[in-house]
């Protein structure tokens, strides 16, 4: 009997499941609220509930496996630490590619002379003096560094030299782009490195909290972390590559869906607090997206399961549309703590809501609060105005946005603190709406109702309240969530089949078919959309929200037992898998260059180069699998040799790609 505890830390809940992996049986489950300012509280609560229903001893547990949506949520919401980016051998035009400038925002970037040519040769000497000056300037202004060099996948020398110098001067975490991907495309590698650097502190907090709870509970087994492709990494290894845990939660949920429902082919929709993750199972497994996961509008270079993540969940921020004469609501993509949930921790929130309701004139910031998520106090790299706001919320607890943001300048500072993950936002959400309708009642009904009243009296451009009653407002909110969820599912299905992104959402006639209010009788044409596959819905609120969504798409719905902890189940059922790619190019007639992780080497024939690359790929994949925690490793090689036939019965060699995959058990 091989016993494994799976954990899944989401934005709202932390779930745990105890599995007998050999028998394929769920023995116990537990659920606790995620405590973002101290993750160990939620983790400890979930693990304690599982162990309370377990007759054995803690040392009977062979492994703890952790999946999380926190990295995915951070990317979707634009939350994370301040990063310094070093672009080596690039000019400023690189920022306009791969949306790199938008990803950086206000974070600093330095352009350093250096980099390499496509054949791995040096393009220009590395400017050590410029690096040294920038490192000393930034060491107290950022939380981590990202380094991307021109053609670093063909020769990583300048990236590694930069990393070593930054580490010596600053001691801060550093991400090199060549360590995350062996593919070409410098700006996209830089984007992936920036996201990775931004997530390091977040994942470190989560892993440290988990290890502390394991120690308290007497669990001495290894801790593993789920990657975005559903495979596992040892926790210490994962700390150097946190961006690989983007889509960790959704990937674990896919594994959990296959385990719980026994499904071979289906659409899987996992609704959480922040996001809805949609994927398709074929023969019991998801398709891998080798060119990189698309998350929150960013095309990364992280190999992951083909999962589409939408900023749409039970805790999506609800915003009234105040311009124009029609009014209405928008949802997400930012997550907000539901008012009904925040009131459990701070009951005084209801007094603040009542005070706003007693004002004669509604304000756009009504029912919107911020609260501190700074266990170590305000970071010193904040601006003076940001530090002042941070200290005020630490002292006061939940604070109306209107009190902090009397000007646009102050509102910008509040938004920056939220985006850095230092302040939490609380506002009306679909979870609150479900409390008002009675569909969900676990939190504080009174706080939800007060929020609904404040939202309903907001006025559109014609001066008319956007909803007649709080119940109408709640139903509008849930209708919008269901409509957007159905649209996302159909969009994902068409994109999966090569039809492009948002094909239905961008078509007014097709999008209209998902509105609860039917098209006008004056409309000459009406259409409907139907999915030709079954739907498996996962998540704590799946049973609440997905029946009307399934009806809108005309599909058969399954919400399996333990659907609310599917991510934890999938985390426990995972195995270790590491993939490596080595490329071969031909810079001269009799020179075949093998681009290895520690620099290129040359061979005089293609056969010799292929033989060397095969051995190197297998050795590197096996070494990484062992570092990731695998035993009993199986190796598999694939090759893509690109040749162009010539008229002289000869082939012109273009490139060879050698792929090695190492798989093994984690226990």
Residues covered by each model-derived region:
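N-terminally biased helix-coil "hinge/interface" segments that flank
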Residues: 1-667
């Amino acid at each position: 009997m091989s016993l494994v505890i799976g954990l899944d830390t989401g934005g709202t809940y932390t779930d745990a499941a105890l599995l007998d992996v050999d028998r394929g049986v769920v023995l116990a489950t537990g659920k606790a609220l995620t405590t973002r300012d101290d993750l160990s509280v939620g983790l400890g609560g979930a693990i304690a509930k599982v162990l309370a229903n377990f007759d054995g001893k803690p040392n009977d547990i062979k492994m703890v496996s952790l999946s999380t949506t926190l990295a995915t949520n951070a990317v979707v919401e634009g939350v994370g630490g301040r990063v310094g980016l070093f672009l080596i051998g690039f000019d400023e035009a690189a920022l306009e590619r791969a949306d790199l400038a938008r990803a950086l925002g206000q974070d600093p970037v330095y352009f350093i002379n250096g980099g390499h040519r496509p054949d791995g040769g040096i393009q220009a000497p590395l400017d050590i003096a410029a690096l040294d000056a920038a490192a000393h300037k930034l060491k107290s202004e950022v939380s981590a560094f990202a380094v991307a060099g021109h053609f670093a996948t063909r020769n990583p020398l300048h990236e590694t030299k930069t990393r070593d110098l930054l580490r010596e001067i600053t001691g801060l975490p550093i991400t090199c782009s060549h360590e995350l991907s062996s593919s070409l495309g410098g700006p996209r590698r830089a984007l992936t490195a920036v996201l990775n650097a931004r997530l390091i502190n977040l994942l470190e907090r989560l892993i440290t909290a988990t290890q502390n709870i394991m120690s308290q509970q007497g669990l001495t087994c290894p801790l593993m972390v789920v990657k975005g492709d559903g495979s596992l990494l040892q926790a210490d290894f994962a700390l150097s590559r946190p961006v690989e845990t983007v889509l960790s939660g959704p990937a674990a949920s896919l594994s959990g869906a296959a385990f719980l429902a026994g499904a071979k082919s289906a659409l899987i929709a996992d609704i959480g607090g922040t996001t809805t993750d949609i994927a398709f199972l074929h023969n019991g497994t998801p398709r891998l997206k080798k060119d990189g996961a698309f998350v929150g509008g960013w095309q990364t270079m992280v190999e992951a399961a083909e999962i589409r993540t939408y900023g749409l969940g039970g805790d999506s921020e609800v915003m009234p549309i105040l311009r124009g004469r029609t009014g209405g609501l928008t949802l997400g993509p930012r997550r907000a703590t539901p008012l009904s949930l925040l009131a459990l921790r701070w009951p005084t929130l209801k007094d603040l809501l009542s005070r706003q309701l007693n004002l004669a004139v509604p304000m756009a910031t009504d029912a919107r609060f911020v609260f501190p998520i700074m266990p170590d106090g305000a970071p010193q790299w904040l601006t003076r105005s940001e530090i002042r706001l941070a200290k005020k919320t630490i002292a006061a607890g939940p604070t109306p946005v209107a009190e902090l943001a009397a000007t646009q300048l102050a509102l910008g500072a509040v938004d920056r603190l939220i985006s850095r993950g230092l302040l939490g936002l609380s506002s009306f959400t679909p979870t609150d709406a479900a409390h008002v309708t009675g569909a969900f009642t676990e939190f504080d009904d009174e706080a939800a109702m007060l929020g609904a009243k404040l939202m309903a009296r907001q006025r559109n451009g014609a001066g008319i309240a956007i909803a007649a009653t709080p119940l109408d407002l709640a139903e509008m909110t849930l209708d919008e969530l269901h409509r957007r969820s159905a649209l996302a599912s159909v969009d994902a299905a068409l994109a999966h089949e090569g039809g492009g992104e948002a094909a239905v959402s961008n078509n007014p006639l097709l999008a209209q078919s998902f509105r609860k209010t039917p098209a006008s009788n004056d409309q000459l044409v009406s259409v409907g959309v139907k999915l030709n596959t079954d739907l498996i819905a996962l998540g704590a609120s799946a049973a609440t929200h997905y029946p009307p969504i399934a009806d809108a798409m005309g599909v058969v719905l399954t919400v399996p037992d333990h659907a609310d902890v599917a991510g934890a189940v999938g985390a426990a059922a995972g195995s270790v898998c590491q993939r490596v790619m080595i490329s071969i190019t031909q810079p001269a007639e009799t020179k075949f260059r093998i681009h290895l992780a520690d620099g290129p080497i040359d061979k005089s024939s293609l056969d010799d180069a292929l033989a060397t690359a095969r051995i190197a790929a297998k050795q590197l994949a096996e070494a990484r699998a062992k570092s990731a925690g695998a035993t009993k490793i199986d190796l598999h090689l694939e090759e893509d040799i690109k040749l162009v036939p010539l008229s002289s019965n000869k082939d012109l060699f273009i490139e060879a790609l050698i792929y090695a995959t190492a798989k093994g058990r984690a226990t």
